[in-house]
Amino acid sequence: MTKIFSLLVAMIFSTMFFMKISSVSAGWLQAHATFYGGSDASGTMGGACGYGNLYTDGYKTNTAALSTALFNDGKSCGGCYQILCDATKVPQWCLKGKSITITATNFCPPNFAQASDNGGWCNPPRPHFDMAQPAFLTIAKYKAGIVPILYKKVGCRRSGGMRFTINGRNYFELVLISNVAGGGEISKVWIKGSKSNKWETMSRNWGANYQSNTYLNGQSLSFKVQLSDGSIKAALNVVPSNWRFGQSFKSNVNF
């Protein structure tokens, strides 16, 4: 009797889960996911978005490298995606009912020496997430290697304000903007020194790094950040006038 009851419960749970997948799939998109970086995700540090140490920058191990179709030449850096293993296709590999929200922090390059369905997982036009190993193991089993997934863009939740790290040299301020909440994906950045009343549009250099070619030494710095959804926030005088290249400053502003 106990075995029959347990079987019925399992069948009900499975039915409910598959109904859930079917009901949400219309609003979600299909892709595949693999993993990299090791069990502690140490191999995911750095990357094509320029965030550096993902542990200290607030992203931890819930990250992924995106294929060409999703990376959008770096414009997708900082964006967040909810990912669910598609148990309707590989129930033996999925962890039922589990999903995870990851941040795009890296680029998964194509491998044209291999077929798109046999090793060249990140070849265009395939949408693909190469997830940090701990993130992948939240939704699927290690032995799966690769699984079909459902994904959708979601808002990013961050602790604290946006962070501005200033690199470069005189007349070339290269500013990494990290820990961005809300839509996450930056579309435009402005900078203003305390000796000016005019906001200067910065150009994106690579990943989440934006540059200015103005001499700004000895000035406190303010930034305006616009996301891909059009929302704008200003971090006024977030950088003090005695700043030095290589320093990072955390604002009290976020989306």
UniProtKB/Swiss-Prot annotation:
Residue span(s) of domain Expansin-like EG45: 46-161
Keywords for the protein's UniProt record, in alphabetical order: Cell wall, Cell wall biogenesis/degradation, Membrane, Secreted, Signal
Induction: By auxin.
CDD domains with a match to the protein in the record: DPBB_EXPA_N
Principal cellular location given in the protein's record: secreted
Subcellular locations according to the entry: Secreted, Cell wall; Membrane
GO biological process annotation, one example: lateral root formation
Membrane-topology annotation of the record: Peripheral membrane protein
Chain ranges of the Expansin-like CBD domain: 171-251
Domain of life: Eukaryota
Signal peptide extent: 1-26
GO CC, alphabetical: extracellular region; membrane
PANTHER family associated with the record: EXPANSIN-A15
UniProt miscellaneous comment: Plants silencing EXPA17 exhibit reduced number of emerged lateral roots. Plants over-expressing EXPA17 show increased density of emerged lateral roots.
Protein name, UniProt field: Putative expansin-A17
Upper taxonomic lineage: Eukaryota, Viridiplantae, Streptophyta, Embryophyta, Tracheophyta
